[in-house]
């Protein structure tokens, strides 16, 4: 299981993170987040991952569930479930801690980015969240 966040700034832009070259889906843009560790809830993993990857502090109460996507059954790959949360409040300025490129994107341009397959169906809920600000 994986969690990710739609981080929306006061200008309505969404923070996207580029996957490292040499890894699966390398070079594609994704919502920041990461895998759950044993014993963690999804929201605990999201708060931890955003701190580790972006050096920001997010409170779980400031994150709203937006949707999920999963690898299709029988695709020959292991099952991956991606839980997406929306967040407008955090402390600190996002700075990549793992060398990944970051970019603030106008919400309307999300669908123009090259995204990993699991992120594609989550663009619609991300747009809805970004528009509600």
Spell out what each predicted region is:
Residues 9, 67-93, 103:
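Active-site-adjacent beta-strand/loop module that shapes the phosphate/pyrophosphate-binding cleft
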Residues 57-67:
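A short coil-to-beta-strand element that immediately follows conserved catalytic motifs
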Residues 84-86, 94-126:
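NUDIX/MutT-family hydrolases
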Residues 127-133:
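Generic C-terminal helix-cap and adjacent flexible tail
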């Amino acid at each position: 299981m994986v969690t990710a966040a739609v981080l929306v700034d006061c200008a309505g832009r969404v923070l996207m993170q580029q996957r490292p070259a040499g890894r699966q889906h390398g070079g594609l843009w994704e919502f920041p987040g990461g895998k759950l560790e044993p014993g963690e809830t999804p929201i605990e993993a999201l708060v931890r991952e955003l701190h580790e990857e972006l050096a920001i502090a997010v409170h779980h109460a400031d994150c709203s569930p937006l949707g999920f996507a999963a690898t299709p059954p029988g695709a020959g790959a292991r099952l991956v479930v991606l839980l997406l949360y929306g967040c407008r409040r955090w402390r600190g300025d996002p700075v990549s801690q793992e060398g990944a490129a970051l970019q603030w994107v106008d919400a309307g341009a999300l669908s123009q980015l090259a995204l990993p397959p699991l992120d594609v169906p989550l663009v619609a809920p991300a747009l809805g969240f970004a528009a509600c600000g």
